């Protein structure tokens, strides 16, 4: 029977009065975009030794005017010599080499009268980072090739180091993923795929929907994420499917998310009737990495964050595609992997 409004079925391990679980040895690691997580891309450039340091300021001004680097503002034009025994102390970046790179003279690279090359030595080729580094790891790799500026995202650095969430936040995250694990086990007991999911309003830490995989031959689309999205819709007076045969799938009437209550939801973040999208400002906890269909459903629902336990061969967030971070989509969301990963892996042998 469908739960009464506001009453989400409570797993026994999470009932009131039970001791607060101690955070387990797991890490919620960010799933970054391909640009953030990829290796540093290198391109060839021409540099030259500065033989007369007194000419450095003039040369820097003239070379920068002749060969500006608008697409590489992160590259510093001068670096100390890498060779401790070198007779010159500085080296200057002249210009990118382009596809037809090869030995070039100063006269070819720095024609007069644009540049007076006095004080420079013979040019040489050097690999330099093509794009600005986005993480500290990329920065360390980039500056090993050529000095590079770096505007650090402290949140990303903290997340990669496992320091983004407090002990209290980790305890709440563990509790929500334990609920998802409980739902997955209920699904397995019914002969369904052992995948569970939970939608939470992080402003109040209130559970809005608990669901599990309900897919079958008649409806192969009812993955756990799709079930939860529909249950959130049911809590908002909408929804399409009848989940009364599945008592572990439950919902609570949704209060407006904090962003909506504060009037911070843009027109683009509302549907045609002016209401916010289904999951605006909400978090999803799911035991298994969502597939492409579910990931796109989360884009359309405007989810805020996704926490998944175990990766999936057909996952569309961390394993493939990184749908949540695609710049060509009109919504992006944060994704973290690894919450109770071992427990989630045990649920489904395919993870």
UniProtKB/Swiss-Prot annotation:
Q: Name one GO molecular function term.
A: catalytic activity
- Residues folding into a coiled coil are none
List GO terms (cellular component aspect): cytoplasm; nucleoplasm; nucleus
- Keywords recorded for this protein, A-Z: Acetylation, Disease variant, Intellectual disability, Metal-binding, tRNA processing, Zinc
- Identify the InterPro entries for this entry: CMP_dCMP_dom, Cytidine_deaminase-like
Region listing for Disordered, in residue ranges:
1-26
Q: Please name the Pfam families in this protein's record.
A: dCMP_cyt_deam_1
What domain of life? Answer: Eukaryota
Q: Where does Zn(2+) bind?
A: 223, 291, 294
Kindly list the positions at which N-acetylmethionine occurs in this protein.
1
Q: Name one GO biological process term.
A: tRNA processing
- Disorder: Neurodevelopmental disorder with brain abnormalities, poor growth, and dysmorphic facies: An autosomal recessive disorder characterized by global developmental delay, impaired intellectual development, and speech delay apparent from infancy or early childhood. Most patients have dysmorphic facial features, and white matter abnormalities on brain imaging. More variable features may include teeth anomalies, distal joint contractures, spasticity, peripheral neuropathy, and behavioral problems.
Q: What family name appears in the similarity comment?
A: Belongs to the cytidine and deoxycytidylate deaminase family. ADAT3 subfamily.
Q: What name does UniProt use for this protein?
A: Probable inactive tRNA-specific adenosine deaminase-like protein 3
The organism of origin for this protein: Homo sapiens
């Amino acid at each position: 029977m469908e739960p009464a409004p506001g009453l989400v079925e409570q797993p026994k391990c999470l009932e009131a009065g039970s001791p607060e679980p101690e955070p387990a040895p797991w890490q919620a690691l960010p799933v970054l975009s391909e640009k953030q997580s990829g290796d540093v891309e290198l391109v060839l450039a021409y540099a030259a030794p500065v033989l007369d340091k007194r000419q450095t300021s003039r040369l820097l001004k003239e070379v920068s005017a002749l060969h500006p680097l608008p697409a590489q503002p992160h590259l510093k034009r001068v670096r100390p010599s890498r060779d401790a025994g070198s007779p010159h102390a500085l080296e200057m970046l002249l210009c990118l080499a382009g596809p037809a790179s090869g030995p070039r003279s100063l006269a070819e690279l720095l024609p007069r009268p644009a540049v007076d090359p006095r004080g420079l030595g013979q040019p040489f080729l050097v690999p330099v980072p093509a794009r600005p580094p986005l993480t500290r790891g990329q920065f360390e790799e980039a500056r090993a090739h050529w000095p590079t500026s770096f505007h650090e995202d402290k949140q990303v650095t903290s997340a990669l180091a496992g320091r983004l969430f407090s002990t209290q936040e980790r305890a709440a995250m563990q509790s929500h993923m334990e609920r998802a694990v409980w739902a997955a086990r209920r699904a397995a007991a019914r002969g369904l795929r052992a995948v569970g999911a939970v939608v939470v309003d992080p402003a109040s830490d209130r559970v809005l929907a608990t669901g599990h995989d309900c897919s079958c031959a008649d409806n192969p689309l009812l993955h756990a994420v799709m079930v939860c999205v529909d249950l959130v819709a049911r809590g908002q007076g909408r929804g399409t499917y009848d989940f009364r045969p599945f008592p572990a799938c439950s919902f609570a009437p949704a209060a407006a998310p904090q962003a909506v209550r504060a009037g911070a939801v843009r027109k683009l973040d509302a549907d045609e009737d002016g209401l916010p999208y289904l999951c605006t400002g909400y978090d999803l906890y799911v035991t298994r990495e969502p597939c492409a269909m579910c990931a796109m459903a989360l884009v359309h629902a405007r989810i805020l964050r996704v926490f998944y336990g175990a990766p999936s061969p057909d996952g569309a967030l961390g394993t493939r595609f990184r749908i949540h971070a695609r710049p060509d989509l009109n919504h992006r969301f944060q994704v973290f992997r690894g919450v109770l990963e071992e427990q989630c892996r045990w649920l489904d042998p395919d993870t």
